[in-house]
């Protein structure tokens, strides 16, 4: 019996997959619980249509992320902080600080997307990776300098 899964089913497949199961399993378990629908021509066409829409949407999201990554590379940010001995900062520069600086430049990036391994605690130039998409990682140049006294 051929069925199209509506949801992920353990040891069988993921939602949207076309699977072949024994008739009893399909009739008595999957269909009554709404976990699958019959794989008739109409449902198969609808599945293919949904997959095409999802593929187009994913490509659009990736292209958008690549455009943002290009803009990030062209937008260096400079942060001024109070400095103590040996160019060590009082406090640190965190992902939240980088996100706020980018927002001031017109780029709304979620702070959780900024992949700062540990807060910046010294002055200097840094390249901070930003996860924009599962396949796209942008980099923003961050310059931390001493605040004028």
From Swiss-Prot:
Keyword hit for RNA-binding: yes
The keyword Nucleus appears for this protein: no
SUPFAM superfamilies membership: L9 N-domain-like (SSF55658), Ribosomal protein L9 C-domain (SSF55653)
Gene Ontology biological process terms from the UniProt entry: translation
Gene3D superfamilies with a match to the protein in the record: Ribosomal protein L9, C-terminal domain, Ribosomal protein L9, N-terminal domain
InterPro entries in UniProt: Ribosomal_bL9 (IPR000244), Ribosomal_bL9/RNase_H1_N (IPR009027), Ribosomal_bL9_bac/chp (IPR020594), Ribosomal_bL9_C (IPR020069), Ribosomal_bL9_C_sf (IPR036791), Ribosomal_bL9_N (IPR020070), Ribosomal_bL9_N_sf (IPR036935)
Keywords of the record: Ribonucleoprotein, Ribosomal protein, RNA-binding, rRNA-binding
One example GO MF annotation: rRNA binding
A cellular-component GO term for this protein: ribosome
Function: Binds to the 23S rRNA.
HAMAP family per the UniProt record, alphabetical: Ribosomal_bL9
Protein family membership: Belongs to the bacterial ribosomal protein bL9 family.
Protein's UniProt name: Large ribosomal subunit protein bL9
Organismal lineage: Bacteria, Pseudomonadati, Myxococcota, Myxococcia, Myxococcales
Gene: rplI
